Structure formats: structure tokens, C-alpha cells
């Protein structure tokens, strides 16, 4: 039995079949005295035909279907809330088997449909501007529960003959704090027999867990990599992101340079603009100095208002000035397009709102 299979079987008595990679399914079939080629058939039913019952897998023997039913669950998510924005963004609040809720967002772009997935129930990182960390971390998601989010959104898109064209792992939780499950998820959605989403159409983001950045670099995946930076120096970053006290900014930059050297890929830096905190011209100049010589791109993010937090949005004129200052210093930068502004679009907001209503 492989290490990964042990990892999954420790999670629950009935692991999600979506948590298994193709080679793991082949190994399981061998253990059951079944032909390994059946794995591709099972994956076709799961990811192309998107059935939610083993009984629907009509080209498998009844005996094999019974074995599958006895050992695996097909993870299903219950839609608790579905909010649709005027710009087409859809935010889902899904309920898991144990009653916990998670958020998933469908964002519509000119180039296709992007899904933002959650990797944890809650978050332990404690960023002082984020609604996701309110209430702390409850548990990690299994790879199958992350896969199920993409499939649930894809099922909604099937009604209009559309498909999920890209995935971003920027929802609730710190992906690198759930590293093994996140990695399995990446491999499943990228695989030809899985959801077949190209590596260049997948983005994973981290707040800066340095040891995992090195580990991720060594995987040498051609997946887009983003780092939540949000500050040009240690003092401001420690105020915004307590993780900076454990993983210092200079060491984080060293890890990022290792990633670039190892993969040949550029890094995206997420930089949320908070009024009067990190959005002045001198902050932009300091940020340009920090990133000098690094193969990177900066996404400036006009932050969504979170009622439980004290930060305010940077005025639009100041955002443009910040962008202009970076460009003048040779930094590749764009302002992220705002989506879902008329719904509970900030990460963790919908879940937090639902929890508040439950406690009234």
C-alpha cells in the first residue's frame, strides 16, 4: 500500500474516490484482482460524465461496482447559499458531510471561467485583514473535497455548455498548510484522465510557509505560483500578516528566488492596498527596491471591505499612482479587476455571515 493511500485512509473510514490519483486507483484495482485499465474507465465516469453513483458506471462489472461502493464515497457538496453578482460572478457556500461550510467562487472572464477553491475549513494564519481566519482553523480538506468543489461548479456550467477553464487556489485557508492534499488535488485536476486543466491554467497561492515553498519548488510543476506579500517591509508585513514573525521577509524572498531558479517560472506577488497602511508612493518605491532583479509580476488588489476588520479601501486615484510608481521603476504590475463587489465577495465573508446568522 502506498504512502499516499495510507494518508487518505487515515482521514476517514470511507475515503473520497476523488482523492485518488490514477496510479493509486490502478494499484487498488490490482489489490482487488481487477484489471488496472479499469482505472481510466472509472476516471471517465467521474470526470467526463460526472456521475455521482457507482451504479451508473455501466461498463464495470457489478462485482467491481460493489467493491467501489464498499470502499469509497463519491463526495457530494450541498449548496447552502448561491449568490450571483451583476458581473456574473457566482459565490457558493457548500456544506460538507460533517456540517462545516466552505466557499467556492466562479469568476467569469473574457478568456473563460475560473474557479477559486478552498483548502481548509477556516484558517490559522491570522491575517489581520481577512475574514477567512475569523473563528480559526477547524480542519483540513481532503483532496477529494477540493476536487468536488470544481466538479460542483462544472455541473452548474454544464447547463449552459460551458466548462471550467482555470482554477485558482486562493479561497479559505492556507494551501501550503494542507500541502499533501493540495498537491494531490493539483495532480488530479491536471491529469489527462482527471479534469484535464492545463498547468498554466492553475494558480496556487501561499502566505509564505517557507519550508513548503522549497518543497513545492522541488516538485517542478509548471503551475502558476503566487505569494501574498501585501507589504514592502518587515514591519508592515508583520502587522498585516502575523506569519511574518515566524517566516521573516528576507528568508521568504530567498525561498522565492530558489523557486524561480528551480522552475524557471516567474512569481506573482499579491499586494492588497489598505488605506494609509501600505499604499503611499514611498511604499511603492520600497516595494520596487525589494523586488529588484526578481522575475515577478505584481497584482495590486483593491481590498473588499470586511465589517469585522478596521481597514479601509485605498482611493482609486491613489491605486493608479501606486501602479504608476511601480511601472516607472520597471516592475511588471497590473490592477486586479474587481469582481463580485455587490455580493459577499471577500474571502470568508459569506461563511462568516452565515455563522453569525446561525448564532442569533
Curated annotation (Swiss-Prot):
Q: Which Pfam families match?
A: Radical_SAM, RlmN_N
Question: Per the database record, which ranges form the Radical SAM core domain?
Answer: 109-342
* Disulfide bonds, paired cysteine numbers: 116-347
Q: Where in the cell is it found?
A: Cytoplasm
What keywords tag this UniProt record? Answer: 4Fe-4S, Cytoplasm, Disulfide bond, Iron, Iron-sulfur, Metal-binding, Methyltransferase, rRNA processing, S-adenosyl-L-methionine, Transferase, tRNA processing
Q: Does the keyword Transferase apply?
A: yes
- The positions annotated for binding [4Fe-4S] cluster are 123, 127, 130
Q: What is its EC number?
A: 2.1.1.192
Q: Does the keyword S-adenosyl-L-methionine apply?
A: yes
Cofactor(s), names only, from the UniProt record? [4Fe-4S] cluster
GO terms for biological process, alphabetical = rRNA base methylation; tRNA methylation
Please classify the protein's predominant subcellular localization into one broad category: cytoplasm
- In this entry, which stretches build a coiled coil? none
Binding-site positions, S-adenosyl-L-methionine: 173-174, 205, 228-230, 304
Task: Output the Gene Ontology terms for molecular function.
Answer: 4 iron, 4 sulfur cluster binding; metal ion binding; rRNA (adenine(2503)-C2-)-methyltransferase activity; rRNA binding; tRNA (adenine(37)-C2)-methyltransferase activity; tRNA binding
Q: Which residues form the active site?
A: 103 (proton acceptor), 347 (s-methylcysteine intermediate)
Q: Which reaction does it catalyse?
A: adenosine(2503) in 23S rRNA + 2 reduced [2Fe-2S]-[ferredoxin] + 2 S-adenosyl-L-methionine = 2-methyladenosine(2503) in 23S rRNA + 5'-deoxyadenosine + L-methionine + 2 oxidized [2Fe-2S]-[ferredoxin] + S-adenosyl-L-homocysteine; adenosine(37) in tRNA + 2 reduced [2Fe-2S]-[ferredoxin] + 2 S-adenosyl-L-methionine = 2-methyladenosine(37) in tRNA + 5'-deoxyadenosine + L-methionine + 2 oxidized [2Fe-2S]-[ferredoxin] + S-adenosyl-L-homocysteine
Domain of life, per UniProt, equals Bacteria
HAMAP family referenced in this protein's UniProt entry, alphabetically: RNA_methyltr_RlmN
Biological role stated in the UniProt entry: Specifically methylates position 2 of adenine 2503 in 23S rRNA and position 2 of adenine 37 in tRNAs.
Name this protein carries in UniProt: Probable dual-specificity RNA methyltransferase RlmN
Amino acid at each position: 500500500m502506498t504512502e499516499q493511500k495510507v494518508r487518505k485512509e487515515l482521514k476517514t473510514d470511507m475515503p473520497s474516490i476523488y482523492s485518488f490519483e490514477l496510479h493509486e486507483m490502478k494499484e487498488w484495482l490490482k489489490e482487488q484482482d481487477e484489471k488496472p485499465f479499469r482505472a481510466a474507465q472509472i476516471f471517465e465516469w467521474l470526470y467526463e460524465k460526472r456521475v455521482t453513483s457507482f451504479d451508473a458506471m455501466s461498463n464495470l462489472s457489478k462485482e467491481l461496482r460493489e467493491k467501489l461502493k464498499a470502499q469509497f464515497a463519491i463526495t457530494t457538496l450541498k449548496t447552502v447559499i448561491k449568490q450571483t453578482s451583476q458581473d456574473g460572478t457566482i459565490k457558493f457556500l457548500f456544506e460538507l458531510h460533517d456540517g462545516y461550510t466552505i466557499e467556492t467562487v466562479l469568476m467569469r472572464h473574457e478568456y473563460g471561467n475560473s474557479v477559486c477553491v478552498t483548502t481548509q475549513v477556516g484558517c490559522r494564519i491570522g491575517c489581520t485583514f481577512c475574514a477567512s481566519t475569523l473563528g480559526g482553523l477547524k480542519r483540513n480538506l481532503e483532496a477529494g473535497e477540493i476536487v468536488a468543489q470544481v466538479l460542483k461548479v462544472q455541473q452548474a456550467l454544464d447547463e449552459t455548455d460551458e466548462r471550467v477553464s482555470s482554477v485558482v487556489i486562493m479561497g479559505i485557508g492556507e494551501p501550503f498548510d494542507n500541502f499533501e492534499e493540495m498537491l494531490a488535488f493539483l495532480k488530479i485536476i491536471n491529469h489527462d484522465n482527471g479534469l484535464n486543466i492545463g498547468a498554466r491554467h492553475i494558480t496556487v497561492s501561499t502566505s509564505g510557509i517557507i519550508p513548503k515553498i522549497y518543497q513545492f519548488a522541488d516538485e517542478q510543476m509548471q503551475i502558476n505560483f503566487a505569494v501574498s506579500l501585501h507589504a514592502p517591509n518587515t514591519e508592515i508585513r508583520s502587522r498585516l500578516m502575523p506569519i511574518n514573525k515566524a517566516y521573516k521577509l528576507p528568508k521568504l524572498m530567498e525561498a522565492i528566488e530558489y523557486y524561480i531558479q528551480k522552475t524557471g517560472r516567474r512569481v506573482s506577488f499579491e499586494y492588497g492596498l489598505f488605506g494609509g497602511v501600505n499604499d503611499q508612493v514611498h511604499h511603492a518605491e520600497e516595494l520596487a527596491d525589494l523586488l529588484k532583479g526578481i522575475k515577478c509580476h505584481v497584482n495590486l488588489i483593491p481590498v473588499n471591505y470586511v465589517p469585522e476588520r478596521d481597514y479601509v479601501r485605498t482611493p482609486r486615484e491613489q491605486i493608479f499612482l501606486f501602479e504608476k510608481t511601480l511601472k516607472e521603476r520597471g516592475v511588471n504590475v497590473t490592477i486586479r479587476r474587481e469582481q463580485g463587489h455587490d455580493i459577499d465577495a471577500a474571502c470568508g465573508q459569506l461563511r462568516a455571515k452565515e455563522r453569525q446568522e446561525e448564532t442569533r
